[in-house]
Amino acid sequence: MMQLVHGGDWAGYRAQYGQDALDFSANVSPLGLPEGVAKAITAALATADRYPDPLCRALRAKLAVHETVPAEHILCGNGAADLIFRLVWAAKPRTALLPAPTFAEYAAALETAGCTVRGQFLREIEDFAVTEAFISAVDEDTDMVFLCQPNNPTGQLTPLALVEALLHRCEACGALLVVDECFLDFLPQSEVLSAKKLLASPNLIILKAFTKLYGMAGVRLGYCLCSNIALLDKMQAAGQPWAVSCLLYTSPSPRD
């Protein structure tokens, strides 16, 4: 039987124990699906007889306004996990560096591509914070680095100055830096904390998702920000053409 490493497997729990669980593993907003999104999905049912836009043009246009980045720097996917796998398959890293502990999906994706995964263990004496030691662990053999902001499961936020220093180290070593900001919007002043101001670097990829903050894990919608158009093109080609349902690509922007 296939074993899942990600949380939120309520169906598996129900099948095994005959009841629902109080699930603290998925960290999804308890407030439910926003009313505007529910209405947009209902309205979009009228288009269900047509294939969705494979480039998510309408959704990317709204996200571009929300994120204040060019639409061509945005790629939408079937949740952030879809984009993690697409990135790994597109970039084909040989060696990757992760903080430990961190979100298990990074290593799961990397291993499907035959990538060697190195973990830099975070220290309890430092409150499991990412420090300069993690930056120093990036070397010439490192092709990809993942950083979860804030980290899952420790909850620690890496200061933006340290993220910038990590990016510079990755640039010097020829590595891609993947900053996962799927939880960042739960924090006050998330816009100030975001690595978006560093997006001029072609080595930076930022992951975002509607899953957590907007209580729509079952809907599956994520996106990434990156100024490296060639890399985004490879990621687009690394997955199926219609990753985002027609029920979603015209949904309201996060501001709605």
Could you tell me what each predicted segment is?
Residues M1-R50:
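N-terminal "arm"/small-domain region of PLP-dependent enzymes with the aminotransferase-like
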Residues F24, V145, D180-C182, L207, ...:
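Structural scaffold positions in well-ordered secondary structure
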Residues P52, A64-R86:
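Short loop-beta-helix segment that forms the pyridoxal 5′-phosphate
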Residues W89-L147:
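PLP-dependent aminotransferase-like
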Residues F128-D141, P153-L177, E181-L213:
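Active-site pre-lysine segment of PLP-dependent enzymes
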Residues A200-D233, C246-L247:
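Active-site PLP attachment segment
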Residues M235-A237:
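Anionic-ligand binding region
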Residues Y249-D256:
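Conserved small/polar residues in nucleotide/adenosyl-binding loops
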